[in-house]
Amino acid sequence: MDPGVLRDDMVDSLEHESKGCVQSATVGGAMRTVPREAFVEEERGAYADRAFERLGTRVLAPSTAARLFEALAPEEGDSVLVVGAGVGYTAAVLAEVVGERNVHAVDITRRLVVEARGNLADAGYEGVLVDRRDGADGLPEYAPYDRILLEAAALSPPAALVDQLADDGRLVMPQGAGEQTLVVVEGDEVVERLGGVAFQPMLVEGEQADTVERNRTRREDREFARRNAEAGAGWEQDWIDWDGA
């Protein structure tokens, strides 16, 4: 079946009042244009409203991606940073709106960076910049950004990303650990809460899927101890091996 017809059917379903995920002509038009099958290696299945697993990451379901795009509200000419490039699909949709050379994407996993670059080039978006970085550090070389999309959950907006926002910029992210909420951040404050979501947690160096040792527990121990250092109770010495940290 013609992929263009499948794309139209997909967006039609997302625009229908039963879902209501796509609300703007801008987002709808971009999603009707990007060949999703180029990013998930399926043709018909690519347009089903479900997520895919690929190289240790989750390719977002179209309805979830649409919610992110609508929350981000990109405009033509905006400079955009995508944290969590994945396979490149969201970067491609944003490139349709703002222009491919205005989209910058980072991912901590090297093989996903390679995958995203290849997918984007094959789909006609070779102007999108994709780099391997710790997402929490952002991409300061190209800051400030009018829009930042964080495709991984965190308890609070990473300070470096907030610093890289333009004065009137907008950051969209899943906030929370167990229960997550899609939020819009302007400045350093949450200005909108847009309902529940379920994303993978944000990773730092050493936690990506192709790393032998994972360091989340040790990192969280250090952060927890640092946040509570003023308590002065000495509790941290009982359960953290500081010499080995």
Model region roles, listed by residue range:
Residues 1-42, 218:
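N-terminal auxiliary segments of SAM/dcSAM-dependent transferases
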Residues 1-6, 172-245:
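SAM/dcSAM-binding transferase cores
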Residues 21-23, 36-69, 73:
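Conserved SAM-binding loop and adjacent beta-strand
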Residues 29, 66-70, 92:
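N-terminal, well-ordered alpha-helical segments
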Residues 74-183, 187-188:
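Conserved nucleotide-cofactor-binding alpha/beta core module
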